[in-house]
Amino acid sequence: MSDLEKLKQTEPKTWAAGLPAVISSMQYIFREAGPLRGGNGLLEMNQKGGFDCPSCAWPDPDGHRSVAEFCENGAKALASEATRKLAGGEFFARHSVEELKGESDHWHELQGRIEQPMILREGASHYQPISWEEAFQLIASHLKKLPSPDAAIFYTSGRASNEAAFLYQLFARSFGTNNLPDCSNMCHESSGLAMKQSVGVGKGTVTMDDFLEADVILCVGQNPGTNHPRMLTTLEEAVKRGAKIISINPLREAGLMGFAHPQHITAMLGHRTKLASHFLTVRVNGDLALFRGLAKVLLENGGPDLDLAFIQEHTQDFHVYQNLVEGISWDEIIRMSGVTEVEIRELAGLLASGSRKVITCWAMGLTQHRNAVATIREVVNVHLLLGAIGKAGAGLCPVRGHSNVQGDRTMGIFEQMPEWFLAALDRECGIQSPRKHGHDTVASILAMHRDEAKVFFALGGNFLQATPDTNFTAQALQKCELTCHVSTKLNRSHLVTGRTALILPCLGRSELDGDSRFVTCENSMGIVQPSCGSLSPASHHLLSEVEIIARLAEATLGKNGAVPWRWLSEDYDRIRELIERVVPGFENFNHRLDEEGGFYLPNSAKARKWDTPEGKAVFSTAPMDVFQSAEGRLVLQTLRSHDQFNTTIYGMDDRYRGISNARRIIFLNPEDMLVRNIRPGQSVDITSYWKNETREAKGFLAIPYEIPAGSAAAYFPEANVLVPIGSQAEGSGTPTSKAVEISILSSNTD
């Protein structure tokens, strides 16, 4: 059956969640984990005293939590982790690596939990079991033989706990390198850098309570209905309290049109809450121009719209910024944003009305552009004009995608941690951290491709499928002497390897770790809380991430060094005692975890204290530009389907966009299809362009969709092959997955 014959298409939905979400969740839970194991897990997930959802980083309520404090994606993440299926020695004996390469990412996901450590020896066709001790000694021998510690790459996924992340970066720095790339490099790195430059802190400045006091909530470049479904509950509560929600995005997404709360009887019977009152269909990468337009209106109106007292007391470079904005024409703003002057003026009026309590939320739609840092700083500029930061009901909210990606950075997973952190680490741990900055994700790929990095170690994740320029990244990994992955399930990164490859299976977030050990996570709003698994481990061979790191560190650095690795791993309280001596805000760490629901880390910008060199919040003055494709070409953005969390493919459907049984599709404006003589469902080949380079992806089905002319969208990881390794956000190094210049032609086989 052809891809077109498999494809089923319906009208895109105009609301999210409700009974279909409940049915989808339960079907997946029952199929993968079974009603008893899956049901018990759901009752513990996101509860006080339970375990943190392994999916997104949206926070749990501080006070009362419902008995079902999870969403469809969280339920699927738990089902995936709690599955009864196992992939062990017999599975890998039946399937060669070449055979596994031919299967889809969705098929890989369905094969179950990795049962025991596995090795792909040089020249072998199949993975084979290996003992833990032999695996650690093998990795240690490769690390010890490197010409320099900087020839090793230590990658981290946002799933790793605070305790695992802290021990991991301590191991890497004890070994002698700052090569600590992580998944944040590919998503919110731009947010952290922009906010640090503008307001002195790289984290969001709002709490859940602020949403209940906000007058206006901007959702920019994000799709909460799929990527952060529990956020819809918060937005619904805000709307019921009188807030207006504004969607700013090239696509109208169902989750912001309407919401049927899956725990409310009225919603099950058909009642839906309208969320967004306004939809601004900005052109791809037109957000900087849009926010510059908002600033222009606010400055034109002067005093009534501005918080002049805040500007005078708390900001710097206001007049420079004012002159810049006043010199920009409306023609430029309209052309670059794709939004009309009337729409911009109406939105500016909403922002400036009343008490100017405005929250702006954003995700990858802002962060994965060449000018991402400048765009996010422009968002901050508008907040500074309004004084909409550091007060109740107002602030900045980068909505992070993985459950502990923010905590991992707090723990030191970063290739360029500041001197105060390294000095504290050295003082408390008795090591000498390197000061030379390490490689981020893209730099790591380039180093492997140049044969400069020879050992790649990943603490979680699916590196090959998460990164840009898939073919280039595959070549880079294949040049390594050794690639190792700490994983729970099979993924494509296990199949495109160095000369020797290891899979080290670990416990999941939902599983018991000894008698009483637990870990902690930090959510998107800076709340640290304990996470204690309750389900029996999938296999008796599994080790915790902490124990894997500790045993590897001991095998590599010896038992008699400054850091007592195994002793630390035996009782996680000991790791937390070390963390509190190194990382500000974690004083009395273990004791404070007794507080129900965890504790908030300090946030200077929320308190209107600006940790910038100037000591104030800083207006930025970047030039206004927009990504422009050549004549006859389109601008492609990559995005998720609904049956997907990051690179994990739970199913083949994208329910809210009306797509079933297909993933190799490209959403196109109907007029763009017409002028290219492309009919709906036609197979097309896509070519991307970067400088003098081209990349190809063949056999995508063309789907007409409500998207701005000149724009296109396709799912990742399938479309990652088109994202050039050399195209990165200025300053942050984030791949520009939301702005890829492409052309499309009918496939020869069509």
Residue ranges: model-predicted function:
Residues 566-655:
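Long, low-complexity segments enriched in small/aliphatic residues
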